[in-house]
């Protein structure tokens, strides 16, 4: 299968891993919308949210809470948005959840992904 997210969770493509368990890997988004923008990616290839089981989705949400709260604390965010794209808005056809920290200042800083990663890993 030629899925970039499958290659990332299998270690074929390097990523900035924030968290991993038997079912998911959380990585920094390489094209972040805000500082700390991260992705929760199931290790099993699931095309979109219509295919994910209730159990798998519950685990994704559990991880979203764990990692999201950590990111918020470490980066000083005052809120967090969880987002799942579907259909034409889903760029990669492998289910994933975006974690987008929300700050009082809405603009992305000039800090690099590497700098942000070092703060929240």
Regions found by a protein language model. Name each.
Residues 1-121:
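HIT superfamily nucleotide-processing domains
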């Amino acid at each position: 299968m030629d899925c970039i997210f499958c290659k990332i969770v299998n270690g074929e493509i390097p990523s900035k891993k924030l968290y991993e368990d038997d079912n998911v890997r959380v990585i920094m988004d390489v094209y972040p919308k805000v500082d700390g923008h991260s992705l929760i990616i199931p290790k099993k290839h699931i095309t979109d949210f219509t295919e994910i089981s209730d159990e798998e989705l519950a685990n994704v949400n559990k991880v979203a809470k764990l990692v999201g709260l950590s990111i918020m604390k470490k980066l000083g965010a005052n809120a967090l948005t969880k987002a799942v794209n579907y259909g034409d808005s889903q760029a990669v056809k492998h289910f994933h959840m975006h974690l987008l920290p929300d700050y009082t200042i809405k603009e992305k800083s000039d800090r690099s992904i590497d700098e942000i990663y070092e703060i929240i890993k």
